[in-house]
Amino acid sequence: MRGCGILVIVLALAGSVACAPTHAGAPQVPLRGIYGGIPQEVVASGRSLREFGIDAVWLGSGSFTAERLAWLRAQRVQAYAEFNTLHVADALTAHPDAAPVDADGRVSPPPDGWQGICPTHGAYRAERMRAFRELLERFAIDGVWLDYHHAHASWEQATPNMPDTCFCDRCLQRFQKATGVALPDAPTSERSALLLSTHRDAWVRWRLGVFTDWVREFRDIRNATRPGALLGTFHNPWSDDDLNRARVEKLAIDLKAQAAYIDVFSPMPYHARFGHAADPAWISRQVSWLGAHLGVRGVPGERLRIWPIVQVSDWGEPVPVGQIDEVLRRGARAPATGVMVFAWGGLRAHPQKIEAIGRTYRALAGSVPPAD
C-alpha cells in the first residue's frame, strides 16, 4: 500500500473492535472506514468523527505521537497503527547487502520505484522487530496492521512488475540448509534456473515459510507486549490461481499459513486501479474467494475477520461518484465484516464523494449487506 506513513481512518464496530461483545446469531454492523488521512473536513463541517460514523483510526507507525493519540481518544475513537515490514528503502544505506538479488546474480532494480528488502537479512529483520515492539510499548494502541509484507515487487497496478528474487548467497545457503536440496557450485544464473524449474516447488514453499515466519514473530511480540491488540495485514487481493499463482509464487504470501497468527485480513481489491473499473462486483468476488479459502463466513464469534480496503479515490482509472455506494457495499458483504475506503488524501478535493461515502456509511450502520 502506497504511503505507509500516512494516516488511516476506519469506522469500526461500536465500542472496542478488539473486544466488543456480540450476541450469538445477532447481525454484525460492518466496520466502515477511510484510509489516507484524518478527515478534518468532517470535523470542520461541525460533525464529530463519531457523528460521521468513525470510531477507529489507523496511523502510520511513524506518525504516532502522544498528542495525536490523546486527540483520537478525545474523539472517542479506537487507535490502530499501519506498520511497514519490507519496504523501508532507507535501510539499504546501512545494509546494502539487504537489496534483493535477481536470477542473474545482480541487485534487482526497484520495480517501478518500489524498493523491497531481502527477507533473510538478519539485521534488517531485527530492526523491524525492535521498531514493532517499541511501537506497542510506547503507545496504548488497539492493534497493528502489517503492510508491504511481500517480496520485492510492484503489484499495485493493472500490469504488475514482479521480478524473481532473492537469489543472494544468504538466501541460497538458507534454502539448502532448510530443504536438504543441494545446488551445484555454479554461477547464480545456473542455480536460480534450477530453483525456478527442477526445484521450483521446494523453492516456493521455502520462500512462503520465510515470510510467514516474520508474521509469527510479530505475533509473538504482540502477545508479549500488548496481548489485547489486534494483529492485521493489508495484503494482495488475488486468489491462489490469479495471474498464474503470482501471489503465492512471486509475492510469497501464504494466507492460510499466516492465518495462524493474523486476526484481521484486509485485502486490497482496488477495482479501478487493477483493471476492473466497470466491474465493482470483482470486489465481492475476491472477498468471497478469500472467505472460502480461510474458512471465514462473516458471522459473530469467528476468530478471523475480513475487512477489505476498497478504492474510491481516483488512482489511475477514476471512480465515479455514482459507483461509490456499490463499491462500499461490495466490500462490506459477507464474509467481510467491515470495509475501508482508499484513500482520503485523494478525496479532499471531491466533496461529493465525501458525502456519498457518508450516506453509505450511515446506511450500512443500520443494515447488514447480504452476500450473493
Language model features with spans:
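Aromatic-lined carbohydrate-recognition surfaces of secreted/lumenal glycan-active proteins
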Residues: 80, 145, 200-247, 301-315
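The substrate-binding groove and active-site-proximal loops of carbohydrate-active enzymes
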Residues: 35, 54-60, 111-129, 197-212, ...
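Aromatic-lined substrate-binding rim segments of carbohydrate-active enzymes
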Residues: 45-101, 205-225
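Substrate-binding cleft of secreted/luminal carbohydrate-active enzymes
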Residues: 261-280, 290-371
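Active-site-adjacent "subsite" loops/lids of carbohydrate-active enzymes
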Residues: 80-139, 156, 188-200
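Substrate-binding cleft/loops of secretory-pathway carbohydrate-active enzymes
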Residues: 225, 230-274, 319
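Short, acidic/polar
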Residues: 36-51, 124-135, 245-258, 319-330
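Catalytic domains of carbohydrate-active enzymes, especially glycoside hydrolases
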Residues: 33-67, 138-143, 258-264, 331-339
